[in-house]
């Protein structure tokens, strides 16, 4: 190792309190519950459909932009431009989709999609009801719920709430 360079371990050796025996056993139980076959089929379709130019009635994944603003000002990102801010569509005039509209969209796609991503351009953790939206999607049996984040708002309490939401 070069003595002049600083190295930071990825997780700094932390063992978070989310890694409990109960959670580990729940994970192991779910490993044998049969979801793996459904997930493999989802991933197979993810690759196969575009290659064979097959279009389904519903996509495998829906991106639901929950927030059209960000807490950073990265120079390459369009969210910092006035043009972007001026052209935001009606549900985003205040910077985030309202909870009722998010639920209506989830109701529309539930049972038809495998995966829901609660982000696109904006920073989803700025949405005041993100955890509630994720929980609602999980209750509607959407298998995979995800979002892309810059991580600035994440802390252990928020992370636990997200994990509990599904």
What are these regions (language model features)?
Residues 3-165:
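Conserved alpha-helical substructure of the radical SAM core
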């Amino acid at each position: 190792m070069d003595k002049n360079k600083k190295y930071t371990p990825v997780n700094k050796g932390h063992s978070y309190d989310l890694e409990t025996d109960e959670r580990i056993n729940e994970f192991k139980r779910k490993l044998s519950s049969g979801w793996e076959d459904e997930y493999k089929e989802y991933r197979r379709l993810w690759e196969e459909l575009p290659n064979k130019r097959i279009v389904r009635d519903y996509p495998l994944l829906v991106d639901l932009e929950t927030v059209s603003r960000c807490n950073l000002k990265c120079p390459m990102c369009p969210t910092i431009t006035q043009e972007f801010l001026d052209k935001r569509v009606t549900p985003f005039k205040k910077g985030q989709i309202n909870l009722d509209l998010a639920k209506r969209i989830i109701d529309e796609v539930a049972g038809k999609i495998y995966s829901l991503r609660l982000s696109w351009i904006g920073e989803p953790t700025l949405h005041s009801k993100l955890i509630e939206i994720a929980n609602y999607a999980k209750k509607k049996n959407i298998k995979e719920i995800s979002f892309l984040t810059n991580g600035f708002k994440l802390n252990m309490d928020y992370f636990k709430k997200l994990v509990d939401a599904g």
